């Protein structure tokens, strides 16, 4: 629901988040989800389990180096819930945790159990120049269960790109060399940032 507000349009020239795209991130499963962000601001609200923290964690996963990345900040300080989310749990699509009494352990259920890819794309706009796209693409092989098993690549592009454009180059593994044609001036290899040359 959009509420009418008599606020001035934010000044052009300020870089603002304009769109978030998610593919196979948490319970955002099976297609590319697009969330346009209003230039005046956006309120993220919904019931428990509706994906609010997953969306915010996706944005953080693109903008924050792994060594400082703390997922599920909304639950931090909530004891056991604070450690339930990781890059692997998001790439795999963890949706349930149950207790296995026979083995005396907690077991996660996943939407994606085999080899899988995941993508997060953030498009920023200033209103005066071309958009800037930041993306992080992940591939997790079948059987991979730790963050060390994830291959990922980060993209910085000075134009609007779409997750559809890069999906073929991460669906079966991160293929940086093949990623270059849709992002022609990209540099880098798996595990490092890809930047477009100025």
List the predicted regions and their residue ranges.
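Extreme N-terminal "head/tail" segments of very large remodeling/mechanoenzyme assemblies
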Residues: 1-195
């Amino acid at each position: 629901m959009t509420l009418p507000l008599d606020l001035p349009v934010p000044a052009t020239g300020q870089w603002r988040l304009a769109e978030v795209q998610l593919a196979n991130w948490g319970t955002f499963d099976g297609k590319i989800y697009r969330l346009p962000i209003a230039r005046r601001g956006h309120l993220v609200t919904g019931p428990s389990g509706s994906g609010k923290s997953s969306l915010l964690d996706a944005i953080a996963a693109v903008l924050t180096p792994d060594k400082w990345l703390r997922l599920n900040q909304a639950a931090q300080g909530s004891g056991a819930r604070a450690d339930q989310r990781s890059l692997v749990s998001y790439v795999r699509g963890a949706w349930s945790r149950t207790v296995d009494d026979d083995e005396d352990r907690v077991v996660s259920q996943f939407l994606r159990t085999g080899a899988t890819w995941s993508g997060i794309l953030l498009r920023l706009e200033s209103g005066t120049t071309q958009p800037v796209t930041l993306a992080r693409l992940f591939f997790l092989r079948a059987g991979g269960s730790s963050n060390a098993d994830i291959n990922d690549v980060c993209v910085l592009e000075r134009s609007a790109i779409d997750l559809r454009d890069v999906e073929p180059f991460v669906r079966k593994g991160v293929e940086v060399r093949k990623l270059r044609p849709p992002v022609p001036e990209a540099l880098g290899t798996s595990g490092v940032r890809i930047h477009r040359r100025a």
